[in-house]
Amino acid sequence: MSKKGPFNIRNAAADTFAMVVFCFITGMFIEILISGMTFEQSLASRTLSIPVNIAIAWPYGVFRDFMLRQGARISPSKFMKNIADLVAYVTFQSPAYAMILLVVGATPEQIITAVSSNVVVSCVMGVFYGYFLDACRKAFKVPGYYTPQA
């Protein structure tokens, strides 16, 4: 987790890349295989989600960092970091996901199924996304996430 500081373009770029890639892949999986949406509905949803994910990626990263700091105040353990990642992911992503599905014409039943499934799957996805985001931040050389080579 990086230290709180001024806006960092590398951080925003890493957060955006991670959000777009991760949500496209996992969203399509959930929508088609679990929620019963057609490939076309899912592709429309994933396409619509790209600008949404671009818009929310950096704010989510800031929110996640805040949640990680709050979790670390309770316990510095890896378990608490995973719980904070999970809570951050579910509470931030579920409303945005429901709105995307509504816009692309998913039925109320499909929306409830997809969002509910996403919440359940997020027990793993939120933590996995946290690791993926950290890896992206390292790859983008975000200060606090990588060690410069001497």
Curated annotation (Swiss-Prot):
Superkingdom, natural source: Bacteria
TM region(s), chain numbering: 17-37, 48-68, 86-106, 111-131
Primary site of residence: membrane
Keyword Hydrolase: no
GO BP: any one term: amino acid export across plasma membrane
Residue ranges that the Swiss-Prot or TrEMBL entry lists as coiled coil: none
Annotated membrane topology: Multi-pass membrane protein
MF terms in GO: L-amino acid efflux transmembrane transporter activity
UniProt cross-references to HAMAP family, sorted A to Z: L_Ala_exporter
Family statement drawn from the similarity comment of this UniProt entry: Belongs to the AlaE exporter family.
Physiological role: Exports L-alanine.
Name recorded for this polypeptide: L-alanine exporter AlaE
